[in-house]
Amino acid sequence: MMYHIPGVLSPKDVARFREQLEQAEWVDGRVTTGAQGAQVKNNQQVDTRSALYAALQNEVLNAVNQHALFFAAALPHTLSTPLFNRYQNNETYGFHVDGAVRSHPQNGWMRTDLSATLFLSDPQSYDGGELVVNDTFGQHRVKLPAGDLVLYPSSSLHCVTPVTRGVRVASFMWIQSMIRDDKKRAMLFDLDNNIQSLKSRYGESEEILSLLNLYHNLLREWSEI
């Protein structure tokens, strides 16, 4: 399943990020890519050795960790260190698949269950640059407002189309979920959403408490932590 997570960053935060990223040191994006991805990748990334990068990636982590919808959809166990990329002048990233595991500075290794892209450019400010994701439901083309995030299974083939006008800047990361299976995670997300909707409409009740108990028992049964 693919999820649109709106408002991870406020417009004020996005503007500040963009201003700081204009001063960043950018390097060839292939430095963080395996052999397969390097053949089709043509973009730039913020140098991870810079002090600015360290500050910005911490802000992204704080923002997603405080976003209730992100937590409900991803049920995160481990988040990768966020990275930042830039596309301009027909730069693109052809179809590829993300690696199944990645190194992690604290945990050693993490499994990539979900991929996330946090858009930092106004979609009207550039042409092209759509994130295209192929999954069992077909092909999806994603180009979200600045500050919004998209979550999708890391097992999906995906690409970024050429940016033919303007500049596309984004942050991206991977998530190891407490729930490895996409279908089980999607069922828990739907159950959680319906519980919250019923609670807001009717208030607390024995039936809602029973559903909440079911949610947590399923999470207890399926989670890997």
From Swiss-Prot:
Against SMART domains, the record matches this protein to: P4Hc
Q: Which domain of life is it from?
A: Bacteria
Query: Domain Fe2OG dioxygenase: where?
Result: 78-177
Q: Which GO terms describe its biological process?
A: DNA damage response; intracellular iron ion homeostasis
Binding positions (Fe cation): 96, 98, 158
Alphabetically, the GO molecular function entries are: 2-oxoglutarate-dependent dioxygenase activity; iron ion binding; L-ascorbic acid binding
Keywords attached to this Swiss-Prot or TrEMBL record, sorted alphabetically, are: Dioxygenase, Iron, Metal-binding, Oxidoreductase, Vitamin C
**Residue intervals passing through the bilayer:** none
Q: Which residues bind 2-oxoglutarate?
A: 168
Q: How is the cofactor bound?
A: Binds 1 Fe(2+) ion per subunit.
Q: Which InterPro entries match?
A: Oxoglu/Fe-dep_dioxygenase_dom (IPR005123), PKHD_C (IPR041097), PKHD_hydroxylase (IPR023550), Pro_4_hyd_alph (IPR006620), Pro_4_hyd_alph_FE2OG_OXY (IPR044862)
Which cysteines bridge via disulfide bonds? none
**What EC designation does it have?**
1.14.11.-
Q: Tell me the enzyme class.
A: oxidoreductase
Required cofactor(s): Fe(2+); L-ascorbate
Q: State the NCBIfam families in the record.
A: PRK05467.1-1, PRK05467.1-3, PRK05467.1-4
Q: What is this protein called?
A: PKHD-type hydroxylase YbiX
Q: Which organism is it from?
A: Escherichia coli O17:K52:H18 (strain UMN026 / ExPEC)
